[in-house]
UniProtKB/Swiss-Prot annotation:
Heme listed as a keyword: yes
Name of the protein this chain belongs to: Cytochrome c
Keywords: Acetylation, Apoptosis, Electron transport, Heme, Iron, Metal-binding, Mitochondrion, Phosphoprotein, Respiratory chain, Transport
Origin species: Macropus giganteus
PANTHER family: CYTOCHROME C (PTHR11961)
Record's GO cellular component terms: cytosol; mitochondrial intermembrane space
Pfam families given in the database record: Cytochrom_C (PF00034)
Protein modification: Binds 1 heme c group covalently per subunit. Phosphorylation at Tyr-49 and Tyr-98 both reduce by half the turnover in the reaction with cytochrome c oxidase, down-regulating mitochondrial respiration.
Record carries keyword Phosphoprotein: yes
UniProt modified residues of type N6-succinyllysine: K56, K73
UniProt-annotated location(s): Mitochondrion intermembrane space
Positions where Phosphotyrosine occurs in the chain: Y49, Y98
Positions of heme c binding: C15, C18, H19, M81
Modified residues (N-acetylglycine): G2
Length: 105
């Protein structure tokens, strides 16, 4: 498991421009991520996803996020997420640790 505080810094630097995490947070360019763990791809209420995201059919969890965040366009070809990914596994683990905490509050 990664470091929550380091993960928060990564989120602020690389994710917060397009995503929110708090319960009831607004969608931006990307969906609000609250409740993402255990949710199917393309299912945040009120956000318009590509068919690729809706049809991927996986459940978000540590393993699926670890793979997705390395290279989003490879994991879900056709996603509208323009972020290139995080190559360092340790940084992805930190971000996932933060998301696990922040999206479940």
């Amino acid at each position: 498991m990664g470091d929550v505080e380091k993960g928060k810094k990564i989120f602020v630097q690389k994710c917060a421009q397009c995503h929110t995490v708090e319960k009831g947070g607004k969608h931006k360019t990307g969906p609000n991520l609250n409740g993402i763990f255990g949710r199917k791809t393309g299912q945040a209420p009120g956000f318009t996803y590509t068919d690729a995201n809706k049809n991927k059919g996986i459940i978000w969890g540590e393993d699926t996020l670890m793979e997705y965040l390395e290279n989003p366009k490879k994991y879900i070809p056709g996603t509208k997420m323009i972020f290139a990914g995080i190559k360092k596994k340790g940084e992805r683990a930190d971000l996932i640790a933060y998301l696990k905490k922040a999206t479940n509050e």
